[in-house]
Regions:
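Extended, non-globular alpha-helical segments
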Residues: 63-67, 74-77, 148-150
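Short secondary-structure boundary segments
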Residues: 10, 47, 120-122
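Active-site neighborhoods of divalent-metal-dependent phosphate/nucleic-acid chemistry enzymes
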Residues: 73-131, 155
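Short, structurally constrained coil/turn elements
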Residues: 37-39, 69, 139-142
Length: 158
């Protein structure tokens, strides 16, 4: 049986310890607990996620790395193909150039055939305009459809 692939963006991992938004932090921690118990799910993160997380200060950085060590995940390296797809998203107006890293996350998830992207980034990821535009481009390029949800919508089953 083929495993379900789920891409976690930086905001999800960062919210494992985010005291200023306790509701999001608790929902993220619950999703993390559920992911630990799902051998049927391939968790995908990218080297871009690792680079972004590494900008956190201590002790948060050590905490997040410790949490990552508790789950089974695959790190994928950003490729030229993914950068190219991010540029296509950019040229088609999905987001502005200052959000190129966000488009790169979406491209990574798409080209690694992730069914879901999980993110707390409502401005750039988890909004109907972005999702619709990304999937229209993906369809035109014969790429897979991707759903983008916050952790709260992933709780209880996916």
């Amino acid at each position: 049986m083929r495993k379900l692939k789920v891409y976690l963006d930086t905001s999800v991992i960062s919210h494992l310890q985010q005291e200023d938004v306790p509701e999001k932090m608790h929902e993220t921690q619950e999703l993390w607990r559920q992911l630990k118990e799902r051998p049927d799910v391939d968790i995908i993160i990218s080297d871009l996620v690792i680079r972004e997380i590494s900008k956190c200060s201590e002790p948060k950085l050590s905490f997040l790395l410790g949490e990552l060590a508790q789950i089974d995940y695959k790190i994928v390296q950003v490729t030229e193909e993914e950068r190219g797809l991010a540029d296509i998203y950019l040229k088609n107006g999905v987001l502005k150039e200052k959000s190129l890293d966000d488009l790169t996350h979406i491209a990574i998830a798409t080209l690694n055939e992730c069914r879901y992207i999980v993110s707390w980034n409502f401005k750039h990821f988890v909004n109907p305009k972005t999702i619709k535009a990304v999937n229209a481009i993906n369809l035109s390029l014969n790429l897979s459809h991707v759903d983008i949800f916050p952790p709260s919508m992933m709780l209880g089953g996916f």
